[in-house]
């Protein structure tokens, strides 16, 4: 990831008190739906439009009162997504990666949690009633996992948006590693260079 150095979780947790930890989660669910009756959706993946106009994943900074990274992440998910986020819990087994950037002393931890489609739909339905809606979070968006016939519409165009930090790279890595796209789809994408 551009400008970021990957750390093992143990190394990240041993950095000491001068470091802040931020945790974010990619929430996804299998989706049997079809766009226009012919384009398979495959999975629903949630991202959010942030207060700064950039796309990112739900989550935030872990506070000192949180007993673990996951406790802090689950608290943040309830604040940003609403009470439907209390129906599931992101666990250590959902952990994907940790990165530090060249800027402030912040470690970014990334998780991916598979939900049922019903759980994901409940999160979407309740998100506008969440504590942080309209403040830190301006709304949820789904990631289009298809490419239209023009070769540009869908995921390639979505990737042209402005993303916070490493969110774009985390998304692409998760799509590939979790098998959320059809085999070979990422290598065949006309992915514009990161702005």
UniProtKB/Swiss-Prot annotation:
GO terms for biological process: dITP catabolic process; mRNA catabolic process; NAD-cap decapping; negative regulation of rRNA processing; positive regulation of cell cycle process; sno(s)RNA catabolic process. The keyword Cytoplasm applies. Mn(2+) 4 binds at residues 99, 173. InterPro entries: NUDIX_hydrolase-like_dom_sf (IPR015797), NUDIX_hydrolase_dom (IPR000086), NudT16 (IPR054754). Gradually increased from pH 6.5 to 8.5 in its IDP hydrolyzing activity. A motif (Nudix box) lies at residues 61-82. Exhibited a temperature-dependent increase in its IDP hydrolyzing activity up to 60 degrees Celsius. Mn(2+) 3 binds at residues 76, 80. Binds 3 or 4 divalent metal cations. Acts specifically on U8 snoRNA with magnesium as cofactor. Has broad substrate specificity with bound manganese or cobalt (in vitro). It catalyses: a 5'-end (N(7)-methyl 5'-triphosphoguanosine)-ribonucleoside in mRNA + H2O = N(7)-methyl-GDP + a 5'-end phospho-ribonucleoside in mRNA + 2 H(+); IDP + H2O = IMP + phosphate + H(+); dIDP + H2O = dIMP + phosphate + H(+); a 5'-end NAD(+)-phospho-ribonucleoside in mRNA + H2O = a 5'-end phospho-adenosine-phospho-ribonucleoside in mRNA + beta-nicotinamide D-ribonucleotide + 2 H(+). It is found in: Nucleus; Nucleus, Nucleoplasm; Nucleus, Nucleolus; Cytoplasm. The phosphatase activity is inhibited by the product IMP. It comes from the Eukaryota. Substrate binds at residues 24, 50, 57, 170. Keywords: Cytoplasm, Hydrolase, Magnesium, Manganese, Metal-binding, Nucleotide metabolism, Nucleotide-binding, Nucleus, RNA-binding. GO terms for cellular component: cytoplasm; nucleolus; nucleoplasm; nucleus. Residues 18-173 form the Nudix hydrolase domain. Gene3D superfamilies: Nucleoside Triphosphate Pyrophosphohydrolase. Expressed strongly in lung, kidney, adrenal gland, testis, heart and brain. Its main location: nucleus. GO terms for molecular function: 5'-(N(7)-methylguanosine 5'-triphospho)-[mRNA] hydrolase activity; chloride ion binding; cobalt ion binding; dIDP phosphatase activity; dITP diphosphatase activity; identical protein binding; IDP phosphatase activity; magnesium ion binding. Mn(2+) 1 binds at residues 59, 80. RNA-binding and decapping enzyme that catalyzes the cleavage of the cap structure of snoRNAs and mRNAs in a metal-dependent manner. Part of the U8 snoRNP complex that is required for the accumulation of mature 5.8S and 28S rRNA. Has diphosphatase activity and removes m7G and/or m227G caps from U8 snoRNA and leaves a 5'monophosphate on the RNA. Also catalyzes the cleavage of the cap structure on mRNAs. Does not hydrolyze cap analog structures like 7-methylguanosine nucleoside triphosphate (m7GpppG). Also hydrolysis m7G- and m227G U3-capped RNAs but with less efficiencies. Homodimer. PANTHER family: NUDIX T16 FAMILY MEMBER (PTHR31699), U8 SNORNA-DECAPPING ENZYME (PTHR31699:SF5). This is U8 snoRNA-decapping enzyme.
């Amino acid at each position: 990831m551009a400008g970021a150095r990957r750390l093992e979780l143990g190394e990240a947790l041993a950095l000491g008190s001068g470091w802040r930890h931020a945790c974010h989660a990619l929430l996804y669910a299998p989706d049997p739906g079809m766009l226009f009756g012919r384009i398979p959706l495959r999975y629903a993946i949630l991202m959010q439009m942030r207060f700064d106009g950039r796309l990112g994943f739900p989550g935030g900074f872990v506070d000192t009162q949180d007993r673990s990274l996951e406790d802090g992440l689950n608290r943040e998910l309830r604040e940003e997504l609403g009470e439907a986020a209390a129906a599931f819990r992101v666990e250590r087994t959902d952990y994907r990666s940790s990165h530090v950037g060249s800027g402030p002393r912040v470690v970014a931890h990334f998780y991916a949690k598979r939900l049922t489609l019903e759980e994901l739909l409940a999160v979407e339905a309740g998100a506008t009633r969440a504590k942080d809606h309209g403040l830190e979070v301006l709304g949820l968006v789904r990631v289009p996992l298809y490419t239209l016939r023009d070769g540009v519409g869908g995921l390639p165009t979505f990737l042209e948006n402005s993303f916070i930090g490493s969110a774009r790279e985390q998304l692409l890595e998760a799509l590939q590693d979790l098998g959320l796209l059809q085999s070979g789809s990422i290598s065949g994408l006309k992915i514009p260079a990161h702005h």
